[in-house]
Each structure stands twice: as C-alpha cells, then as structure tokens.
C-alpha cells in the first residue's frame, strides 16, 4: 500500500467503517446482544479510541441523539446528496417531496404486486428440498419491488443487489489495508450505481411515465427542480435501505422462527400475530444496529462531555433491549403491549420506507406460514455467517427446509 493510500485510509477511518473491537468473533457478530448489554450497564456512553467515536447504548440517550439534529448532525462520513445525510431546512423540504411516494395510499397500491411476487417466489421454492431464505425469498422480493419503483429492469436485480451490498459492507478488520479496501469498494459501488441511475433518469427525461422517477424529475422545491445528484442520492438510498433493511427483516424473522418452535406454532395458530412478530423482530433482531451522527457543538450526554466535531454512534440494537424501557428485553414476546423500538430511527430521519418495509415483511411472512406446515433449519449444526457490516444485522445465507402444504 502506498503512503498516499495509507494516509487516505486513515483519513477515512470513520466509525461507520470498522466494527467494534468487542465484536471480534463470528459468534459475537451473530448474536452481539450480551456485549451490548454489558456495555450498556458498564459504560452507557463511552469513547472508543480505535474507531475515534463515542458509542451510546441507553435507550433514552440514543433517542435524545436521534431527535436533536441541531446538536447531532447527519452530515458525516463520505458526503453524498442523500436525504439521509442532510439537516434542516434542506432535509425538511426534500423529505416532504419524496414522502409522496410513501403515503398510505401509495404503499397500498403496491400490495397486489408484492403478493404476486411473493407467490411466485414461494412457488419456485417448492421445487427445492432446501432453500436459502436470503437468495430465494427475502432478497429478491424487496429488490424486485424497488427495481420496479425506480424504473430498473427486473433482470438487473442481481446486479443492483450486489452493488447495494457493497455500500453497507464494513472493513473486515481495523487495519489500514482493510479500511482502504473497503473505502475503495464503496466508492466503486457508489460510482456504478450513480451511473446506472443517471442512465435511467436520462431515459425518463426523454420518455416520462407515471412512476416515481418521473415524479421526482418533475417535482420542485421553492421553484427549483432537484439536482441530478439529489435524484441519484435518493435512488441509491431507496435501493440500499429497501434491500438491506427489508431483506434482513424478513430473514431475521424466519431465523428466529427456526430457533423457537413454540413461537412458530403460536403464530401458525393465529396468523393475526404476524404483525406482532414483525415488530418484535425489529426490536429483538434489529436489521439496523446503529446510526451515526456528528456533534455540532460541545455538549454533555449521559453525564459525559463530548467535544464538537466528535462522531457519535447511537446503538439502536442496544436501546431496543434496554431493561429500563422493555420488560424482559431478552425474551421474544409477541404479546408486548406496545413496540416503542427505534429500529426505523426517530425524529426527522424516521425511515420514510417503514410502511413499505412492514407491508413487504407482513405479506412475506404471512404467505410463507400459510403455505407451509413447518419451517426448520436445513441442518441442526448449520453454521451461519454474519453480514460483514458494522451496522447491519443479518446473515449471508439462511438455509432452511420448508414442509409445504
């Protein structure tokens, strides 16, 4: 590695890029919650010199960071024209615009198509004795829906999913080379997807249609159209958020049902509980483990002084298991009276696509359960492998055996 590359990798050594040192083993990455519990009890707000950031683990502290954008800014890391990394007032105006695509009416219109795609994927799965939930079901479903929303050909779904995965992959370790390789891969992935969506936008300008892309092209904020970089940033965000969050939400729900046959039978006996299973999966196996912010001024959090410009990582997965907020937080309970989890964020950056993710997950799990008598691990000693991302929780593959009706 050249000196220039080394300097670049150190410059890019942002807390989003490398894992916590405590999560060093595959076992810990597959089930990190005991570590979060220990950190939440012993150091609820702590500085990590390796990642040069402050980690926040308590529910109230995490919520405070997320709901105070003036104090904890979203402008961080590698900058793009994405709504995810904007602050008000720019964020407010753009969010109001793009939220039109996720109104209850707009999402409801996708229901039939989601059911059709789900039925097709499960029909294909019937032909196999063992299926990989990720590759055969949880992965294709949201990518197909998103591809259609963005005007991408369905046959490109494997391609765009591959590059979407690259954008959330973390460094394999904390070495300069690993960080530099990861930064290089992310930049290549972002460049590819930028060119990909730039081409689609060009086609929509020449031939408008009644779809999301045309709506975004024709929309105005204060009399101005969105810039191409803003449009591309939103397309990439929707792709990545939909792919990673929804794929892992569905897969994590199935993973838990294979781990707990009692809960699986309870849900089969009353499918009205599917929605509760989805919400409890969001809390118990949160697809997004953490969210990064940057302190805009010297401040205090949890009795700890944080200097202006410091990276602050809010650990949602830890907050979702805070014993001061949830009764028996380490138990998967489908009869919780409420679900104040933070898995879709909080405040102005609450996930726009949450209604769509919930709809897709509910349809996917309901259909899977109604068409089967049993879902179990493909092998008792099946070894799962965690997704190589510091902030996304899920597995690379989830082989299961489904007894179809």
From Swiss-Prot:
Cofactor: heme
Coiled-coil annotated spans: none
SUPFAM superfamilies: Cytochrome P450 (SSF48264)
InterPro entries the UniProt entry points to: Cyt_P450 (IPR001128), Cyt_P450_B (IPR002397), Cyt_P450_CS (IPR017972), Cyt_P450_sf (IPR036396)
EC number: 1.14.-.-
Family matches, as Pfam families: p450
Family of the protein in this entry: Belongs to the cytochrome P450 family.
Functional description taken from the UniProt entry: Cytochromes P450 are a group of heme-thiolate monooxygenases. They oxidize a variety of structurally unrelated compounds, including steroids, fatty acids, and xenobiotics.
UniProt-recorded name of the protein: Cytochrome P450 109
Gene for this chain: cyp109
């Amino acid at each position: 590695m050249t000196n220039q590359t080394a300097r670049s990798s150190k410059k890019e050594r942002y807390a989003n890029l490398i894992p916590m040192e405590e999560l060093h083993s595959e076992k810990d990455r597959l089930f990190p919650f005991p570590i979060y519990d220990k950190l939440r009890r012993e150091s609820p707000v702590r500085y990590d010199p390796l990642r040069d950031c402050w980690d926040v683990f308590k529910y109230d502290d995490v919520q405070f960071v997320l709901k105070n954008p003036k104090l904890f800014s979203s402008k961080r890391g590698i900058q793009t024209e994405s709504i995810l990394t904007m602050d008000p007032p720019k964020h407010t105006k753009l969010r109001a615009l793009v939220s039109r695509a996720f109104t209850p009416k707009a999402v409801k219109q996708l229901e039939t198509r989601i059911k059709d795609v789900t039925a097709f994927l499960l029909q294909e799965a019937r032909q196999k004795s063992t299926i990989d939930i990720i590759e055969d079901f949880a992965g294709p479903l949201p990518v197909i829906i998103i591809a259609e929303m963005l005007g991408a050909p369905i046959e490109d779904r494997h391609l765009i999913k591959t590059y979407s995965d690259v954008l959330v992959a973390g460094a394999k370790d904390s070495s300069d080379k690993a960080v530099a390789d990861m930064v290089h891969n992310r930049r290549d992935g972002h460049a590819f997807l930028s060119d990909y969506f730039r081409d689609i936008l060009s086609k929509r300008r020449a031939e408008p249609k009644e779809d999301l892309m045309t709506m975004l092209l024709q929309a105005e904020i204060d009399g101005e159209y969105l810039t191409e970089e803003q449009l591309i940033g939103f397309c990439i965000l929707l792709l990545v958020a939909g792919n990673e969050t929804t794929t892992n939400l569905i897969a994590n729900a199935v993973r838990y049902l294979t781990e707990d046959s009692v809960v699986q039978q309870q849900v089969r006996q009353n499918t009205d509980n599917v929605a509760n299973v989805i919400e409890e999966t969001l809390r118990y196996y949160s697809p997004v483990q953490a969210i990064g912010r940057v302190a805009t001024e010297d401040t205090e959090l949890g009795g700890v002084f944080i200097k202006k410009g410091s990276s602050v990582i809010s650990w949602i997965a830890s907050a979702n298991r805070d014993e001061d907020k949830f009764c028996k937080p380490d138990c998967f309970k489908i009869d919780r009276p409420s679900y104040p989890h933070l898995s879709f964020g909080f405040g102005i950056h609450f996930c726009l696509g949450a209604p769509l993710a919930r709809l897709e997950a509910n349809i996917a799990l309901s259909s899977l359960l109604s068409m089967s008598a049993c879902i179990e691990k493909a092998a008792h000693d099946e070894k799962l492998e965690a997704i190589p991302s510091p902030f996304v929780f899920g597995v690379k593959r989830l082989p299961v055996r489904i007894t179809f009706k």
